[in-house]
Amino acid sequence: MIVTPHISLAIPAHARSIAEMSREYIEYGLGWSWTQARVIKAIHDEATNVAVTQQRGAVTGFGIMRYGDERAHLVLLGVAAGHRKRGLGALLLAWLEKCAVTAGLERVQLEARADNPDAIAFYLEQGYGQAGTVPGYYRGAVDAVRLEKRLWSPADAAP
């Protein structure tokens, strides 16, 4: 039986798991920026959505997206190692993109570690295009590949 994972907004009780996943899967080798306290701050931020998937009460994936005046910015997206290649990342990303469209935003922008070809390939598969590189983006130590996706166009909304 295939079960579609449930996506929900994170609550402060999820912050520790999110922070630990960020440290292990995203911030490896860089120090720890997305601590539990910072995740809690994002959870309470009105311009940010923190979404999670869970299995048996444990966080299996998460995404953090900030909504600006002109575009959304995917801050972090991570899936626990034992739950990858099952579509969780794509589901979380699509959920966050739908929130951005609901907010009236045309584009999502993100940065991926240049030394993480799997992440870059994932975003390309999800319809993102490379928009450049940012030298030393991650604490001056690791370059980033900037990716962007147009979610809709004002012309799409015209009668």
List the predicted regions and their residue ranges.
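Residue-level recognition of the GNAT/N-acetyltransferase active site
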Residues: 80, 84, 111-113
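Short secondary-structure capping/turn micro-motifs that flank functional sites
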Residues: 38-39, 116-117, 139-140
